[in-house]
UniProtKB/Swiss-Prot annotation:
The lineage of its organism: Bacteria, Bacillati, Bacillota, Clostridia, Eubacteriales. InterPro entries: Cobalamin_biosynth_CobD/CbiB. Belongs to the CobD/CbiB family. This is Cobalamin biosynthesis protein CobD. It comes from Clostridium perfringens (strain 13 / Type A). Pathway: Cofactor biosynthesis; adenosylcobalamin biosynthesis.
Amino acid sequence: MIKIIIGYVLDLIIGDPNNPYHPIRYIGKLASNMEKLWRKVFKKNLKIAGFFAWLFIVFITFGVTLGIVHIANKINPILGTVVSGILIYFCISAKGLKVEGLKVIKILKEGDIVKARKQLSYIVGRDTENLDEEAIVRAVVETVAENMSDGIIAPLFFAGIGGAPLAFLYKAVNTCDSMFGYKNEKYKDFGFFSAKLDDVFNYIPARLTAYLIVISSFILRLNCKNIFKIYKRDRYNHSSPNSAHPEAAVAGALGIRLGGANYYFGKLVEKPTIGDAKKKIEISDVYKTNNILGMVSFLGMVVALIIRCILEVII
């Protein structure tokens, strides 16, 4: 249990360390190497190539993490707990998510919209060159809302079930989707299993995140009446079966509209809207979303501890 608290507190204090030695970056390097290898092995069947790449990436990551934790526990149980806590910390990005969004808003408030667009491009996939202030703020809110699941709640959820090794396994799944889960010509076959299996792994965390956003909205005295209506109506308004769940909850809590049309690689992509435009999206909505994020991450840690307690009693 203490290892989950260590991971949560370290993220709360330090945040996401932006350096080339971050363990998650090594998963990315492993993924690149596995892609090259399995594309050569199965040149004529890229779906199979992608599946084997996914399998090796995920289980190598899990095995290495399990080995590190096992060795640390063998040396000293306290060391094992500390190492596990640090590894869990590397899987959580609550503070990093908040900080990156606020960087965009700080620049925007200074009046440099060109620089704000550039900063936004580091955290979103859409084209940002022509976005106005409202579109920039909307993009930040959407990014924070969507990533509450895969950046915070999902790692904590899997850490609660299986400690650092399972949290890292999840991050490997998520990394595969981030790198391969595109519908373009290069990855539509190779990334097929990465995208589908990411949906499977995020099924429970995405819905759990939405429920925690609802609870957080009650605690923070936001629009609790509207949140149920919007969540029930719009939770599937996305090409992903999971992404709209936290976004719909946030949109309902703030009384704003998210989603809609965006440009990706120069092409206009029409997406369903999420929420009702009861008011214009403002910079203050980013701060409110960050308040929700803080409460959700705390509640997520509590849920992970409860899961761990239940499993320890059962097992």
